[in-house]
Swiss-Prot record:
Substrate binds at residues 264, 321-323. It is an enzyme of class 6 (ligase). One of its GO terms (cellular component) is cytosol. Coiled coil: none annotated. Its cofactor is Mg(2+). Mg(2+) binds at residues 199, 213. Binds 1 Mg(2+) ion per subunit. This is Succinate--CoA ligase [ADP-forming] subunit beta. One of its GO terms (biological process) is tricarboxylic acid cycle. Heterotetramer of two alpha and two beta subunits. The lineage of its organism: Bacteria, Bacillati, Bacillota, Bacilli, Bacillales. InterPro entries: ATP-grasp, ATP-grasp_succ-CoA_synth-type, ATP_grasp_subdomain_1, SUCC_ACL_C, Succ_CoA_ligase-like_bsu, Succinyl-CoA_synth-like.
Length: 386
């Protein structure tokens, strides 16, 4: 789950991580009032959307007086920002962060992520702050420094100091930088984050180390023990189909193709998308119905897939392990009748009671094309959608 920058900074502040003072605003008047309350000579007006690249898209402006705050707030609120992370459709700006300006001496990058290859959290840092870390990794990988953290003992002071020295934090500010990184790590672990990214981390003219931006992502599977974080969820920033899917424990991610996919298991879902691409088709979505593919789940999955007007056909690829193929077949038939499906539908079943499942499909009287294998199913649906 993602949260907004201002929310992320509030979380970090509670862990002793230094961030600029700021207030969220939902209207132009609130933005001006927030700037008045901050009482600083310079304010930064920042669009709050769940995407990076806001500055380049015109979503971050420096205001030197209240008139400029009003002008920038009017120009940003309600507009659609298009960045490299939003896609061409962009995201509408519905809230702003009004933040005190600071005298930036140097920008850095600091981030915590899970390294799946080593099964450890890794602290990454670079003195090339303010730019995309992927860009730095591609052009100057030697400027990225990493510390792998033993989960049994957590981030150690010597590791944070080594990072601070490697990215050339001024010696007199190393202590602050170490405290910053230790607090960031505590927040990452205690709040079950999957990403904690500070870009940029800055040193200021008055000798401070602080987070000028903050991106926190949380493990959705752990939200049951973080009610405070769950309350920060902004449904306006999420895809409506993904929200609907989550109500039925379906994992749905929209894509740009025209072949709807309904699969049980994330691995099989990815393999299904791969084989559709292999036969020159384009998947319209990733949709994992999970192990308990009930008739209700299958019906809702069909509805979600069909809400995408680009879908020209559907490929159902189910392995009946926990679920029996005959039960799945009955669910597919019931769902097909309920939604009044008129698009081409190819179904591939394998596993427990597969022959009975195929028999049920064949005797349904519905226009369902049975596939003998995953490859056969992919070829058939690609052919049917033309």
């Amino acid at each position: 789950m993602n949260i907004h920058e201002y929310q992320g900074k509030a979380v970090l502040r509670s862990y002793g991580v230094s961030v600029p003072n700021g207030k969220v605003a939902f209207t132009v008047e609130e933005a001006v009032e927030a700037a008045k309350e901050l009482g600083t000579d310079v304010c930064v007006v920042k669009a709050q959307i769940h995407a990076g690249g806001r500055g380049k898209a015109g979503g971050v402006k420096v205001a030197k007086n209240l008139d400029e705050v009003r002008t920038y707030a009017e120009s940003i609120l309600g507009t659609t920002l298009v960045t490299h992370q939003t896609g061409p459709e962009g995201k509408e700006v519905k809230r702003l962060l009004i933040e005190e300006g600071c005298d930036i001496k140097k920008e850095y990058y600091v981030g915590l992520v899970l390294d799946r290859a080593t099964s450890q959290v890794v602290l990454m840092a670079s003195e090339e702050g303010g730019t995309e870390i992927e860009e730095v990794a591609e052009k100057t990988p030697e400027k990225i420094f990493k510390e792998y953290i033993d989960p049994a003992v957590g981030l150690q002071g010597f590791q944070a100091r080594r990072i601070a020295f490697n990215i050339n934090i001024p010696k007199e500010l190393v202590g602050q930088a170490v405290k910053f990184m230790m607090g960031l790590y505590r927040a990452f672990i205690e709040k079950d984050c999957s990403i904690a990214e500070i870009n940029p981390l800055v040193t200021t003219g008055d000798g401070k180390v602080m987070a000028l931006d903050a991106k926190l992502n949380f493990d959705s599977n752990a939200l049951y023990r973080h009610k405070d974080i769950l309350e920060l969820r902004d449904l306006d920033e999420e895809d409506a189909k993904e929200i609907e899917a989550s109500k039925y424990d379906l994992n749905y991610i929209p894509l740009d193709g025209n072949i709807g996919c309904m699969v049980n298991g994330a691995g099989l879902a990815m393999a299904t998308m791969d084989i559709i691409k292999h036969y020159h088709g384009d998947p319209a979505n990733f949709l994992d119905v999970g192990g308990g593919a009930t008739a209700e789940k299958v019906t809702e999955a069909f509805k979600i897939i069909l809400s995408d007007k680009n879908v020209k056909g559907i490929f159902v690829n189910i392995f009946g392990g926990i679920m029996k193929c005959d039960v799945i077949a009955e669910g597919v038939i019931e769902a097909t009748k309920q939604v009044g499906l008129e698009l081409p539908l190819v179904v591939r079943l394998e596993g427990t009671n597969v022959e009975l499942g195929k028999k049920i499909l064949n005797e349904s009287g519905l226009n369902i094309v049975a596939a003998e294998s995953m490859a056969d199913g992919a070829q058939k649906i690609v052919s049917l959608v033309g």
